[in-house]
Structures are given as structure tokens and as C-alpha cells.
Amino acid sequence: TRRSSDLLSTRYLSFPIDKPYQAFAGRDARLSAMVLFPGQNFGSTKIIIQGGLVKADGSGYHYRTQASEKGQDGLIYYTYGAEKSTEYSGFDPTLGHYTRSGFLFKKFLQIESPVEQAWSKGTQPWIDFRYGEILLNYAEAVIEKTTSTSAEKQAAQDALNAVRKRAAHKDDIALTQANVRKERFVELAFENKRRWDLSRWRTFHKEFENRVRKGLVPFLDLRTNPAHYVFVRV
């Protein structure tokens, strides 16, 4: 237990206890296609991701330690969102298969298929090269080439925006190096492309030198009735 003033001294946005995923509403559609948010369902299973619990009297909080507190509604709440370790998916340091980022991987998974805790059960071949990458490769080649013609630049911009419009974007963006690199980062996430992109751009050392990766931890704040969620970068 620590004092809540140490971590929750900032005024945080709050989100409903039954819908913490509302924190990510209005984001790029590809985000929800790639990751599971706290409180979402995967098939018929609710995904519980929680790393902290603020005491109802505001005297302190629990973070990444199994504990329980009574809320102002008289119900018992737990640090990780549930009493049993098989019921939650985040931040428990005692086992190695809980998320520490606040999110779970979703891309490429088939929601309707039953989950099996075993190796080599998949039947889908690995997609090494897909059409979206072809479009992004072309856009990058044109923007990096100093002698690109106006027609090539227009075709490359069309290719770049075709990737975005498939993901429900309505607006067009300009063909710039920054935009091409950002779209590769978003569109090709979790496809084993990022390391090679950074190496090719000679920016790998800048991205990872003295870089501390942080997670977004959902805390259930019991100081209100009903209780609500806040997200803390830790």
C-alpha cells in the first residue's frame, strides 16, 4: 500500500467501472483491431486488466500487490479486478503471462475459434508480405527518391491514403516522410517490420537509447460511488 497522493496527485479523467475501454474511444480504427482494451470482451469472455486500487477513504492505494478493499457501495474490490488469478489478465508480478502494458494482443487472432493452451495448433500461414505493405513500400520509395516526378508523387500519395481509407479514415494526408513512417508504424504493427524500418532509416539508436517503456495502468478509484477507473502511466 502506498499513499494515493504520490501517484494520483494529478487530476485524471475518469471512466465508468463497467466500460473502462471508453478511454480509447475515437481513436484510429486500427488500434481496436490490433489490441484488446481493459473491460472489452474477447468472444464471450470479459478481459479484466487492472493494476491498482485506490482506497475509498483516499488514504492510500494498492499497486501490483494482491489486496482487497470495500467500496463506498459496500462491495469488495480487488487490486487486479478479480479475486482469482485465472480471472484477470494484467500486472500480477508473480507470474509471467500477465500484461505489463495495459493491453493484450489481438491482431491475427480468430475470436470465434476456441482457445487451446498448446503449441502448433494454428493453421493460418504466416503473412510475410501483404498488399498494404506494397502500397507503403511504394510511398516510401517515392518520397525518399530525390528525382521523383509529380506523377509518381501523386500515385504514392494515393497509395498512402488507400491504406488509411481501408481503415475508415475519410481525410487525405500529404505525402511526407513523417506521414509515410507513421503509417508504417501503425499499419504494420506486430508484423515484424518495425525493427527493420528503424534500421533502414538509421533511427534505431535514437528510438531505443535510454528509452524507458511505460504501461498504462487502470486504477479502480473507490473514492466515489459508483467507483470509476483512471489510467496512470507507470
State each model region's role:
Residues D6-R130:
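Flexible, polar/acidic helix-loop-strand segments at domain edges
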Residues R2-S5, A118-Y131, L160, R164, ...:
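Long, intrinsically disordered, low-complexity segments
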Residues L135, E152, A159-A162:
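Alpha-helical solenoid repeat scaffolds, predominantly canonical TPR units
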